Design a protein with these regions (language model features):
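Short hydrophobic/aromatic-enriched beta-strand-loop microsegments
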Residues: 36-37, 97, 114-123, 189-192
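A mature extracytoplasmic/lumenal domain signature
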Residues: 31, 38-40, 102-104, 136, ...
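Short active-site oxyanion
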Residues: 14-16, 93-97, 164-165
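Metallo-beta-lactamase
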Residues: 1-12, 101-163, 246-266
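Catalytic core of the metallo-beta-lactamase
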Residues: 25-28, 126-188, 204, 208-211
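Cap/insert and terminal regions of metallo-dependent hydrolase folds
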Residues: 70, 77, 97-99, 103-106, ...
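Pre-active-site segment of Zn-dependent metallo-hydrolases
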Residues: 1-12, 20, 29-76, 83-91, ...
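Conserved N-terminal glycine/acidic-rich loop preference
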Residues: 62-68, 76-82, 107-122, 168
């Protein structure tokens, strides 16, 4: 679904979410615009011509975005921390702030991105009256041969005067979701990863399957969950078309509202 960004740039009041692709979401709420794990590159890899390439182009061009107040990054894997995209975002708007888990600020700063704030689990910061909370998740980090788990990974809660949004990042299912729901919920909307779960024996600890994604949204006390982290890059063994079907089927057995957006689609919440 092509989205030229016109309505997004004009929007100052309606809370919306737009799926750019993979774990990249544009959220507009309570007077702020922010991105999650932005990647516009064709290949998430240290070597651009080696690795999984996009199956679908980004839903909105970078240049067509509204002014971005801040970016949240879940961890340093190449499909979530994409330096070419981050550099371009920093150039497009010198006021954009970049929030990263502990151990990741140096990487951005060495690449010319100065407005970086490193956060630990439990840290919070106020942006224009909206709170950004760095929270636990169950994953790992690695960007080169000798840096496995040397930087932190996280999920994020964005809580404003009117709306509350949860971004699960990349994660396996864990009991911490219930704690997040108790402390920061309920959420109007939770973005949960539903892809990259096969083979299950290898992926289970760090990647939820669609049924677990539904349970995670229930645990954080979300009214509605939106599926993400699927259908953009072929990262694992399940068919690209399978995750949203299983996600919808699992959600329909519960009280949870479930959204499967087309890439580029905007929906209000």
């Amino acid at each position: 679904m092509a989205n030229n960004g016109n309505l997004l740039r004009e929007n100052n009041t309606t809370p919306t979410i737009t799926w750019i692709g993979h774990a990249t979401l544009l959220v507009q709420m309570d007077g702020v615009n922010f991105l999650t794990d932005p990647i516009w590159s064709n290949t998430p890899s240290p070597i651009p011509f080696i690795g999984p390439s996009r199956w679908v182009e980004p839903g909105v061009e970078l240049a067509d975005l509204p002014a971005i107040d801040f970016v949240v990054i879940s961890h340093n894997h190449y499909d979530h921390l994409d330096l070419p995209t981050l550099r371009e975002l920093a150039q497009l708007n010198t006021e954009t702030e970049f929030f990263v888990p502990m151990g990741n600020a140096d990487l951005l700063q060495k690449n010319g991105i100065s407005r970086v704030r490193e956060m630990n689990w439990g840290d919070s910061i106020n942006v224009k009256g909206t709170m950004v909370h760095c929270l636990p998740t169950q994953h790992w980090s690695k960007r080169s041969l000798n840096d496995t788990r040397k930087s932190l990974w996280s999920s994020w809660a964005i809580t404003g005067p009117q709306k509350r949004f949860y971004f699960a990042g990349d994660t396996g299912y864990f009991d911490g979701f219930k704690d997040i729901g108790d402390k920061f919920g309920p959420f109007d909307l939770a973005a949960v990863p539903v892809g990259a779960y096969e083979p299950r024996a290898m992926m289970k600890a760090t990647h939820m399957n669609p049924e677990e994604a539904v349970q995670s949204a229930l645990d954080v006390r979300a009214t509605t969950a939106v599926a993400m982290h699927y259908g953009t890059f072929d990262l694992s063994d399940e068919p690209l078309s399978e995750p949203p079907l299983r996600f919808k089927a699992a959600a329909e057995k519960t009280s949870l509202g479930s959204w499967v957006l087309a890439i580029g689609e905007t929906r209000s919440f």
